[in-house]
């Protein structure tokens, strides 16, 4: 039952994503714009760009995910789908988890694929790329899960884009610190395993708690 519900929701979301494929490209284009602006602002000095490349790439991915966060549940709230979720024979937290996975796949996964190209724009040293990809692979799902809780808290409010950002950014800061810090540690010849393990631990905790918290927030918003 839960697997069939997940397949149905993913199929619906993929159809909606295809119909709004122009909107789905916005996070990737925004991240590219952030990287290009940093490259232009810092000049053509490769050493200066390489020094800030991990932080810039992490910041670009974070802001790109934040751009699409307000729409995570808003469309479903407007067309009545969230009420159907609450009446579905599967747990609400499961549908929230599936939707969050879809959000990660549409906003963060393309950026993970494009990270080597974006790293070349910033002269990222090749030996730092595996650590950067590992930190993004662990950190971006964590960002999506934290963002789902914030989006659920504000789903009943109109024009809550700024409020979503204000609530989400403080939660994102530790992920950004450990994600960019792992690459900085590798650049200094230190072991980045500690920061990566902290990201992994945060992801495991968020996988358990974030869908439950988001589901509770949706129930409160619709009650």
Regions found by a protein language model. Give the residues of each.
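Junction motif at the cytosolic side of a transmembrane helix
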Residues: 204-223
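Transmembrane helix boundary and interhelical loop/hinge segments in multi-pass membrane proteins
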Residues: 66-86
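Hydrophobic alpha-helical transmembrane segments of multi-pass membrane transport/permease proteins
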Residues: 21-43, 58-61, 167, 171-178, ...
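Hydrophobic alpha-helical transmembrane segments of polytopic membrane proteins
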Residues: 133-152, 204-205, 209
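Long, hydrophobic alpha-helical segments
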Residues: 53-69, 73
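Aromatic- and glycine-rich beta-strand/loop motifs that create alpha-glucan
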Residues: 1-27
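Hydrophobic alpha-helical transmembrane segments that constitute the membrane-spanning cores
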Residues: 97-122, 142, 146, 179-180
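Membrane-interfacial helix-loop-helix connectors in multipass membrane proteins
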Residues: 41-52, 116-137, 155, 183-198, ...
